[in-house]
């Protein structure tokens, strides 16, 4: 298993990965196209307990726990060699067919779960942050203050004992405290943390934000990328690349240029990982573009959802096809959208099932927009630091991705950008909030901003988004998957609202305000009724938590609270209902 202490030496495979990334970034500064496609590298975790092998398979298929994540979040009371030896002894004694009671007893004797991740009180937490005074409505101000108290409830730190025996744990040891989403998610997650950090910085928690960034930067140094979350079983995949915008947020609030100077090389490595591991050549109208998709090289079910993945794949007889299926499930998890009809390719478009998942064959709008913004930000960072050669290099990459976004993803007929189907060489003309992501990342010709804003607003209206009082749904297809209708997710609300605002076009800004206020009111209604904030909501029933997926709805909730703060910052005069006068702001 990969060592997880800060001082642990990287494996030969990890060193090779880091060299590849470094070479990709420094080998040729002459052309943005110099970073080519390579075969995605395989898992960094080979643990027989947490990542792959007969022990993991037997426990998870034995249904010792209803939620498979529960098992892989346990730590071992002995070294892995003892854990595995005891398992082999059990298998020998039971003829390779232990029953559920025997497996439960084995887990009880060899694993524990307490005190691995411990509560933490952020020293920079403030009881009455200055931001609260900006919120004009007293009801919303009280709510915002309540959510500020939640930071203390969902703050964690990895226990010191983990660093003493990292091989016994699935948790990845990091030096600084962090914010967990809440509920079953008791480790840090990558893309969640962007919206969490928005909330932290608005409530004055600059040091906590810096610590979270340092944790992520240490992941890039140790593994070459940021895993999906803070567990070794997530080392098979990343998540949407938001580290560079997180640093930009931090710099906006602190002006800490020394932090940027110290870490600019690590930010380059993270972008290099995506540009070298996630790209593919896309040909349209006789021209070839380098574009990104979510893709994972990792066989077998996801450890934390082993049973669900195994059942889905059991009727696939061809081993190569089964591996592809598992990899596309993991790639969908890497996207953050696990799962959604967005990743289905079938004769009926998205109207299939998970058996039709084809994540690697879809060029997602937001991933390419994120990468364009990342390259653009790195160019700006290097300009600020006085590195003109590097600034030009990343500006060229940003220009290359901008051209691809314009030429491949833009749909003139729809007035937005659409995912591209590699298998059938065509746009996927279905509604997803990410269809306006280039407006969110400002990955567009600024001279056309108002045109794009007007067309995006018209597109959203045409697709009936104003009919959903509980938030903008992830799609318009009710599949039962959690990233489909009727679920409305906080980050997608942020993307749509800020996309419309970025256009500076009147109809777009009016719609942005309407959608943001609806979201605030729906969230507040749910909070008033339950005293909880949820990870997702029901677009059809304002304030009701969302459903579907592989686990029950989770409370907390990190990114939900962050988006509330974002919207209250954008619209400080917002009110809980229409009976209270609200000025434009």
From Swiss-Prot:
Catalytic activity: alpha,alpha-trehalose + H2O = alpha-D-glucose + beta-D-glucose
Residues annotated as the enzyme's active site: 338 (proton donor/acceptor), 535 (proton donor/acceptor)
Cellular component annotations (GO), alphabetically ordered: extracellular region
Tissue expr: Expressed by the venom gland.
BP term (GO), one: trehalose catabolic process
An example Gene Ontology molecular-function term: alpha,alpha-trehalase activity
Signal peptide: 1-32
Glycosylation sites: 207, 348
Binding sites annotated in the UniProt record for substrate: 184, 191-192, 228, 237-239, 302-304, 336, 550
Name of the protein: Trehalase
UniProt organism field: Pimpla hypochondriaca
């Amino acid at each position: 298993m990969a060592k997880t202490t800060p001082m642990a030496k990287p494996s030969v495979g990890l060193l090779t990965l880091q060299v590849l990334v470094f070479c990709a970034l420094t080998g040729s500064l002459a052309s943005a196209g110099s970073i080519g496609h390579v075969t995605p590298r395989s898992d960094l975790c080979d643990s027989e307990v947490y990542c792959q092998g007969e022990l993991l398979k037997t426990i998870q298929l034995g249904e010792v726990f209803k939620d498979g994540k529960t098992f892989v979040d346990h730590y071992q009371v002995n070294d892995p060699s003892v854990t595995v030896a005891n398992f082999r002894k059990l298998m020998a004694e039971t003829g390779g067919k232990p029953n559920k009671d025997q497996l439960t007893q084995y887990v009880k004797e060899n694993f524990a779960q307490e005190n691995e991740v411990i509560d933490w009180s952020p020293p920079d937490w403030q009881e009455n942050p200055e931001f609260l005074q900006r919120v004009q409505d007293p009801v919303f101000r009280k709510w915002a203050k309540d959510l500020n108290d939640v930071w203390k409830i969902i703050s964690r730190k990895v226990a010191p004992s983990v660093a003493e025996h990292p091989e016994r744990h699935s948790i990845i040891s990091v030096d600084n405290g962090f914010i967990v989403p809440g509920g079953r998610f008791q480790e840090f997650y990558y893309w969640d943390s962007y919206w969490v950090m928005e909330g932290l910085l608005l409530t004055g928690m600059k040091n906590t934000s810096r610590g979270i960034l340092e944790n992520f930067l240490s992941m890039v140094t140790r593994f070459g990328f940021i895993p999906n979350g803070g567990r070794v079983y997530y080392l098979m995949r990343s998540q949407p690349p938001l580290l560079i915008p997180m640093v930009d947020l931090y710099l906006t609030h602190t002006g800490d240029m020394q932090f940027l100077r110290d870490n600019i090389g690590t930010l380059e490595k993270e972008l290099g990982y995506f540009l070298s591991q996630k790209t593919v050549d896309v040909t349209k109208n006789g021209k070839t573009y380098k574009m990104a998709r979510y893709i994972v090289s990792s066989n077998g079910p996801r450890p934390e959802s082993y049973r669900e993945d195994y059942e889905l794949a059991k009727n696939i007889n061809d081993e190569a096809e089964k591996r592809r299926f598992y990899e596309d499930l993991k790639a969908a998890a890497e996207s953050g959208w696990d799962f959604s009809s967005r990743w289905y390719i079938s004769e009926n478009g998205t109207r299939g099932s998970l058996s039709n998942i084809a994540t690697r064959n879809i060029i997602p709008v937001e991933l390419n927009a994120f990468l364009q913004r990342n390259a653009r930000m790195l160019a700006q960072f290097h300009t600020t630091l006085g590195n003109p050669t590097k600034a030009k290099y990343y500006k060229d990459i940003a220009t290359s991705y901008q051209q691809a976004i314009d030429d491949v993803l833009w749909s003139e007929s729809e007035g937005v950008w659409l995912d591209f189907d590699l298998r059938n060489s065509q746009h996927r003309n279905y509604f997803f909030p990410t269809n306006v992501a280039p407006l969110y990342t400002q990955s567009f010709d600024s001279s056309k901003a108002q045109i794009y804003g007007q067309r995006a607003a018209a597109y959203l209206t045409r697709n009936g988004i104003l009919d959903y009082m509980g938030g903008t749904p992830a799609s318009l297809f009710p599949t039962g998957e959690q990233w489909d209708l009727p679920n409305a997710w906080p980050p997608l609300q942020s993307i749509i609202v800020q996309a419309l605002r970025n256009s500076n076009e009147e109809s777009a800004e009016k719609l942005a305000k309407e959608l943001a206020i609806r979201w605030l009111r729906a969230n507040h209604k749910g909070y008033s009724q339950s005293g909880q904030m949820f990870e997702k909501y029901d677009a059809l029933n304002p304030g009701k938590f969302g459903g579907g997926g592989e686990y029950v709805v989770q409370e907390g909730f990190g990114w939900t609270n962050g988006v509330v703060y974002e919207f209250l910052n954008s619209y400080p005069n917002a009110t809980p209902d229409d009976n209270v006068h609200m000025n434009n702001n």
